[in-house]
Swiss-Prot record:
It comes from Pectobacterium atrosepticum (strain SCRI 1043 / ATCC BAA-672) (Erwinia carotovora subsp. atroseptica). InterPro entries: P_starv_induced_PsiE (IPR009315), P_starv_induced_PsiE-like (IPR020948). PANTHER family: PROTEIN PSIE. Keywords: Cell inner membrane, Cell membrane, Membrane, Transmembrane, Transmembrane helix. The lineage of its organism: Bacteria, Pseudomonadati, Pseudomonadota, Gammaproteobacteria, Enterobacterales. This is Protein PsiE homolog. It comes from the Bacteria.
């Protein structure tokens, strides 16, 4: 009995440390999200360079990455301390799209990245199918 009480207490302490760490990470991500918002506004309104459209698109994708990580942390707390798999898949798809936008010089690499996105979309479909849903 005493061993199980200690295990429960240790699990609760570790869960509290994890929650504090995730809240700190969420705060940092919100700060970066605000910083990226100002950067996007600057690129959109002030910059008139030729490369500004690429910077704008890359900035938007980075913005969505920050947003998805924050949504993942929110969902973690809402779902009883559980990270849903589909949010990680969304983040992976967005990160690969950003990679294609930033580094599209090699057609073979772009094809491999596109195949990876297709694989992630199929994985997302399977993860959301009724066979793999939790009850």
């Amino acid at each position: 009995m005493a061993g199980s009480a200690r295990s429960a207490m240790a699990a609760k302490a570790l869960q509290t440390i994890l929650n504090i760490g995730l809240l700190a990470l969420a705060t940092i991500l919100v700060i970066f999200l605000v910083k990226e918002t100002f950067h996007l506004a600057k690129v959109l309104l002030i910059s008139s360079e030729k490369d500004s459209s690429y910077q704008l698109i890359e900035g938007i994708v980075i913005y969505f990455l920050y947003f998805e990580f924050i949504a993942l942390i929110v969902k973690y707390f809402q779902s009883g301390y559980h990270f849903p798999l589909r949010y990680f898949i969304y983040i992976g798809i967005t990160a690969i799209i950003r990679l294609i936008i930033v580094d599209h010089k090699s057609p073979s690499d772009t094809l491999v990245y596109s195949a990876a996105i297709l694989l992630l979309v199929v994985t997302l479909y399977l993860a959301n199918s009724n066979r793999l849903k939790r009850e």
